[in-house]
């Protein structure tokens, strides 16, 4: 079957890989000059099934109000007259109940665990290298209140058989020895030993090369303008230059830009761009740098080791599609790093980056069939695109091929939002 994949980030390229592996003739379109150059370019680097949780959770509305007042706030909301944003926020607030949180976290962990296993399988099949480490994630708590609420997450982890360790400060230092230098900064942590780290951009580029070896065609520098459709099926993709490309199946994997593409077809995807920032800097002292990923729970900042580099990622900024680099957001990332790993890297040589994470109100991606018989979506992964990419691509390839996916998939499809739309 001829399949057009729209989007060349980590989600689009993994989709192409699994489709090609299933025997399909695949073409990938992306407006950038190469693979993984937008949201996948400099994300936090975590592959974190254990940390997969919706932002919509009990207590979040009150926490959000406090965050907005912090100097180094993890959440930034720019006042703007944008009905889509306020509708999205209303849906998110509706998911801040305990029942919704347990349901959403459960399905996110289900996909993330499957995806981590799929990534390991892919690594075994291909030998792909991308500065990966299998040394877990340490969620670090600076306050006793944060530590006391860890049971909200461990109950779901128990239900899905996800390994974890609740650690005292000495246990945290055993996992991340450099933290001994800042022993008074934290009171404990939650370690997720099954988590991994890796450079999503490097992975995406190298997987694209492997896809090309399998016959996948990449057309970079091609912007998608609109979809043609007739009688409940997509009949073609029109590019910005007016060229129309045709296939038998179509995959919309354009991240935050997917809703605008599908809206003229009557499909309303509640995916909003949540802007994140990162710093990437060289390691200057091995013994003072992180071993894997440390998640600073106070500032919601992830500090990740990627080979001879440190990646510091975080902040949730609701500012539409703006990709302006803002100094205060950089200051928050620098504050977290200097608090926890003050001698680990050289901030004077850091590169500052921002990207738009495609977020749904319930935190769960939108993967699967649509109301159009040959149109599929693979978007809405939020901060977990790298974590969920392989599992989403593998699940989607099974659906397009007519095979039953290896995990329950119905609750990831676009139709869960149709009634609300």
Swiss-Prot record:
Coiled coil: none annotated. This is D-amino acid dehydrogenase. One of its GO terms (biological process) is D-alanine catabolic process. Pathway: Amino-acid degradation; D-alanine degradation; NH(3) and pyruvate from D-alanine: step 1/1. Keywords: FAD, Flavoprotein, Oxidoreductase. Belongs to the DadA oxidoreductase family. Its cofactor is FAD. InterPro entries: DadA, FAD-dep_OxRdtase, FAD/NAD-bd_sf. Pfam families: DAO. GO terms for molecular function: D-amino-acid dehydrogenase activity. It is an enzyme of class 1 (oxidoreductase). The gene is dadA. Transmembrane segments: none annotated. Its EC number is 1.4.99.-. It catalyses: a D-alpha-amino acid + A + H2O = a 2-oxocarboxylate + AH2 + NH4(+). One of its GO terms (cellular component) is plasma membrane. It comes from the Bacteria. FAD binds at residues 3-17. Oxidative deamination of D-amino acids.
